[in-house]
């Protein structure tokens, strides 16, 4: 469940706020036997868009999460912060360039806990192309720093990773509130421990604005 409220929106400055709640239910089998877990996540997330010049804008969002209940079972840290923010330069009505800094960090406010902590830092670059009702956006994610300790029960040492991605997003706006999208991405991952991984992502979306 998420609720968004737009406090202010005009060409010079926009500011909104999203609040949310999610429940996670787990049913699994481990060595001692069958078990269940039930975890909750609370979210608050401001977003903004600021006009710096006619062609240059500063925008982004910041999500703050709080996790509760059965964290030792699920392995999650109790707190998480995620943000993506940066600059967009518009060359003309067709072409723009957006370069963002992305951070996701899981940590524990309770000093007695260390499970589920991680950090991800990336540079994300987008090249939005607008052609009438069509929009095409090639993009890339370049890993700056990434580590995790998801296996804290067996090995408290942090494991380093290197994730990079290239992708393509396509959208079509029917100009009646309805829009559809297609997306494909390829990601390669290198790890301090274990083999490298490669992933293909594909997505289809339908959106309706009232």
Region locations from a protein language model:
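Residues that define the transmembrane beta-barrel architecture of outer-membrane proteins
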Residues: 1, 36-44, 75-83, 105, ...
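Hydrophobic, aromatic-enriched interface-forming segments
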Residues: 79-88, 92-110
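Intrinsically disordered, low-complexity segments enriched in Gly and acidic/Ser/Thr residues
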Residues: 105, 112-180, 194
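Residue-level signature of outer-membrane beta-barrel architecture
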Residues: 5-7, 46-50, 54, 85-95, ...
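Short glycine/proline- and aromatic-enriched beta-strand/turn motifs that initiate or cap beta-hairpins
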Residues: 1-14, 19-24, 201
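Outer-membrane beta-barrel "beta-signal"
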Residues: 184, 197-210
